[in-house]
Amino acid sequence: MLVNHFISWKINYYLSTKPYQLTGLSFLLFPLTFNAQEAEKDSISATIQTVEIIGRRSQDYVSDYSFAATKIAMKNKDLPLTLNTVTKELINDRQAFRLGDVLKNVAGVSNASFYNQYSIRGISQNEEGQIINGMRTRQYYFLQPMTSHIERVEVFKGPASITMSSVDPGGTINMVTKKPLLNDRYEVSLSGGSFDSYRLITDLTGPLNKSKTLLYRFNGAHQDGKSFRNNVNNNGFLIVPSLSFIPNEKTSLNVEMIYNEMNGNLDRGQPIFGATARKTDLNSTPISLNLGAPGDFFKTKDLTLMGSFAHHFNEHISFNASYMKQFWDEDTHETRTTNSFVPDISNNPVPSLAMMQYLERVQHWEVDNINAYFNFSYKTGTFEHQTLLGYDSHIWEKKNGGKQDAARGFLMKDGTVTASYNPANSALYQTMMYNGITIPKPNVNPFDLTSGALNHQGNDYSVLNIINPLPTALTTTHAVYVQHLLTWKKFRLLAGIRQEWFQDRTNYKKPEESAFRNQKLLYRVGLTYSVSESTNIYGTYLTGYQPQSNTTSLMPGTSGFTGGISASLYKPLISDLKELGVKTKLFAKIDASFSVYEINQKNILINANNPAEPDQLIQRGADRSRGFETELTGYILPQWHIYAGYSYIDAKVVDDSNPALVGLAKENTSKNSVNLWTRYNFSAIPALKYFGIGAGILYQSKKIPWFTRSFELPAYTTLDLALYYAVPKTKLQLALNVNNMTDTSYWVGAQNYLRLFPGAPRNYLFTATYKL
């Protein structure tokens, strides 16, 4: 039977003959049209949990709660901050197999490159790794993670520093994995499409015993794909088993494993030919041009083990704990530019000849996360209280055996290699001729960008002149925090403080070990007022902190930072957020949010853009980002879904050692962006009842690159379309997704003339899914 109703957050949960009422969680399903039995089970599974143990059965674009934002599963409407959620249903409808494809649905979030690297509200991410189920993993960001095991992706805007460690000022991306369901469900899908891309995905779940106290879920995926870019592959497989044990109405446990192997290439972007200031032709080279060699590779193995435990002592007191252990290994061979052109004998750049380097890197990391907290619910008179007392730790060890060797620079006549060219000593350098021009001979063969030029793309270097064992390191963060939610009439006051202690030990367990320590007290306060049942207004203030030592390596070109001999060269990144907003429900069907904000950050770490030292870093004084966001999620009609957003970002440099930069726009930031996805099912039309259609639009206004202000990346609009068909009298569903239908040429980001990141041309993906 189909129903349309509200489900209260106070419900009875039966695991035996005894009903047990949990009153410590705020959870409400918005009025939607779906199966009543599924609705009941959804509310049950959400209500028993204070950490996520049981999965979500409802199948729509709306997820109105979050565990990670406050650790008390507040309704999103009551949160005094902006939280955007992309559910697995939207992920599946768009066939968004990579995280970057998921995040283009979120207002104010944009790709800065091909990597797992994003700008949120005009502020680029600094931290390496991913956050999974509220805990931080560590891995290089060059390949985007698969999403087949993801229940939803949450984006917390601003520094979510009270409940998470060392978060980025612009926002935090949290990936929530799929958990076991109470009923059997089996799903297998096979996809194939452009660029010789093939994917196989399986999702199996259900109970393992009659009493349904032991549940399982298994997600697996295999990807074999090329790219529109030359010499680029992205292959891998993913195995994610999960078990949930619920022996009684008070206790629950989940254990989970994620094993991910990826074998691809580091794609450093498209170089352009003959580029000069204000005379830059972005189409001077094909968007497929990649300077990497066919023999290059980027191989990683990532094993993550997780456990979550929750126990309710009574209806007022509960305890929650989570643990994560991660092992990560990397083996990389890479041919790339030095972000510069080869000079001639007079030291003038030759803008058709890219200076190259070759790197070999091996690394082994281990990560431990612990998160534990007590939750107390009580009343004093007319006031309702929910107090959280917690501790967490994050330990990241870089193991022995790591290295980053390189070949770059110029060859000298005595057989040595020097990092840079000095025209005053030109007689000491080996030379060669290029199109009638005398140039100092590079250690690694340069790449000729001239159309039709013959380039032998291989590991062509004379001397592996940089032998760099990566030092062992141990980075630890310990924190205690207190959070209090006070509810009185129509007001909710959410306040919290966090004391964090940080230590970075370089050359860990070696005689030359050195240590750097830092600490910070962080706080936040947010007030929500319920204007009506459907409308809340809020204001919030948050502070953030990142210790910029060996932990930071995500900024462009900072690959050598993880091998730095000092942990204390740079001041910590300090940030804060001020935000006002409105959250409401329009026409009882569409969740809408509107917010204005200001984010300030100080001591920003950026690349020095020094070709002789490509990994050199400097610090900028301060940036400021102000903006406005609005988002709509829900149903226009019962069969018509919508997910849309608009973002305006005014991000500027407010303090820099170069006075000419003060007041200028921040790099890689679009002022205006629009995202829209909508799906319509023809269920009300008998002749078309098995069909559905989808359409999406993404608009980004112009932006400037990271390392040069001499050219702009133009604004662009892309159109995506989808067609869905449920084969009658079978469990088979078919989907055809066409991305960039108009075959628009565009660039998502850039660093300089030699590293632009073009968007994919028109491409398609056909998917067949069988469900039981």
Task: State the predicted function of each range.
Residues A107, M135-P159, M175-K178:
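Short acidic/polar hinge/loop motifs at secondary-structure boundaries
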Residues Q223, S227, V240, S244-H312, ...:
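Acidic/polar loop-and-plug regions of large Gram-negative outer-membrane beta-barrel proteins
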Residues H312, S318-M324, W328-E334, K571-Y635, ...:
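Membrane-embedded beta-barrel scaffold of Gram-negative outer-membrane proteins
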Residues E598-N600, Q619-W706, T769-K771:
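Gram-negative outer-membrane beta-barrel transporters
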